[in-house]
C-alpha cells in the first residue's frame, strides 16, 4: 500500500489538464507512442471537439523511482461548473491533487471552487504552473496570485509545460514525495466508493470504485448500500483509456472497475458505497447525494412520429448519465415530447447534441426554466417546472424562486460592466475582494432564472472573454413573478410562456411580440400577436394581411363598382380570420431564448 499514490488534477477549463494527463501517461509508458493521441483521456467526440472533459476518467500508471516501483492512479476530473458533483466524488477518492494553473492567465473562479472541495477532503495540494513555454507566461505573478486567493504556499510550486514535456519528471517525483499513501484497514469489511459509472453495451453498467477498506474479489457477493440490492462481481479491471487489465482482486487503497452485469446504471450511482453482502460495513461513505437537476426544458422531435425514438434515446443516455431526469409532456404547439431536467446549461447543450449526434434525431428545445415553488391560497405548496403549469393568478399566494451564490473573477477594467450586468440580473452583492491590483473577485446572490438564459454569454461579452464564473445553489426566496403568455391570432401558444419578474414583464412582452412579428409568416388575413398577463394584454403587434389587387380588372368606370369588390374582399378576409389557424415556424420558439 505504501507504494500507491491516488491523485486528481484540478484546473479551470483550458488550463491544460487533459494535455498534462497525456504527458504523464506517456512518461510512464502506459500507452505506446504510436497509439498515443491528444487528449487520450477524453473519450467522447464531443469532449475532443469542445475541448472539455465531461466524464471523469482514470488510468493506473506505474513509475520507477530509486529502484522502487510505484503505482500512480490518475483520476481526471471535469472542469465545468455543471459537473461539480462528479468533481467532488473524484476528489474524495484521492489523497492529493495537482492544482494546475495557466502561467499566462492566473487563477480562475472554477479553480477556486474545486480547491475548496479539495481542502474539505483534506487533500495534499501541489501547485503546478503550466504552459511556461508561452511567450506571455509569467510564473512569478501567477504564484503570487495563488498565494493571495487561495493562501497556498507556492515556494515549491512546480513549473511545467505539458506541451513540450518540460518539468514532467520533477512533477512525478513530487507526486511520490508529497502525496501521502492511502490509509485504511485491509482486514475490515469491504468499503468502496463509486466515483464514476458508465454503460458499456457488452458488459452492462460499470462502476469505477476506490476501495477504502477491505478488498473486492472476483465472485464476491456485494451490496450497493444506496439501493439496497446485492450483485455478484463478475469481473474486475484496472482502468486504462485503451486496454484495461483484468485482475482478481482490488485491494485497499486501489482503484478499479467492477463488472456486475447490471442492466441499469441507476443501480450504481456516483457517490454510492459498495460493501460485502454477508459482512457489510456499518456506515456508508458520507456525502452521497442523488444528482438533482436544476434546469428544465422541453425537448420535442421536429418529426412527431419520432416520439418513441426519442424516448428510447433518452433511456439509453440515462444509462450513461444518471443526472438526466425526464417525463413525457404534450404541447398544443409542438405535439408530444419530454420535459427533461439537466444539471445546468452546458449539460443541456451536451445532452441535446448527443441526442442529435448519436441517435440521429432532429430536436427542438423550449426555453430553459428552473423549479419554482408556489404556495397557493388554500395553503398547499406545489413545485412547477413548466411555466404552463402555473395556477391562475387568483389562486397564488406567493411564488418562491431558486437563488444561486455566484463567484465571479474579472479584470478590474471591466468591473463597471460586470456590476451593471449583475444589477440588471437582479443580483445582490455579498462581497467584493481585490485579488491583485488588476483582478477582482465578486460574490453575488442571483436568481437562478436569470442565469439560465444567457448570463454566461453576456458575462463573456462584457469582459471580452476574460471573466470566469462559478455558482452553487443557495436556496429559495420569495419573488414578485408573473407568467407572460404569447397569443397568436387570439390563442395562447403554450410553448412560448415564460415566468418573469413583474417589473420586467412590460419590456419583455414588447420585445417578444416585436420579435415574433418578424417571424410569423404573413397570412391571407391579419394576425394579431399579443403578450398578456392573465387576461390583461400588455403589448401587441399586427402582421398585416397579404391582399390581391381585386380592382385591377376595372378600367375607369364608377367608384362604387371598385368599392363593391373591395368590400367583398374585406368580408372574405373577416371570415378567414374567424376560422384561420397560424402555423408557427421553428425560429419563433428559439427567439424566446434570445430576448434580453
UniProtKB/Swiss-Prot annotation:
Location of this chain's protein in the cell: Cell inner membrane
Keywords of the record: Cell inner membrane, Cell membrane, GTP-binding, Hydrolase, Membrane, Nucleotide-binding, Protein biosynthesis
E.C. number: 3.6.5.n1
Keyword Transmembrane: no
Signal peptide coordinates: none
PROSITE patterns for this protein: G_TR_1, G_TR_2
InterPro entries per UniProt: EF-4, EFG_III/V, EFG_V-like, EFTu-like_2, G_TR_CS, LepA_C_sf, LepA_CTD, LepA_IV
Pfam families tied to this protein: EFG_C (PF00679), GTP_EFTU (PF00009), GTP_EFTU_D2 (PF03144), LepA_C (PF06421)
Similarity annotation: Belongs to the TRAFAC class translation factor GTPase superfamily. Classic translation factor GTPase family. LepA subfamily.
Name of the featured protein: Elongation factor 4
Organism name: Nitratiruptor sp. (strain SB155-2)
Gene designation: lepA
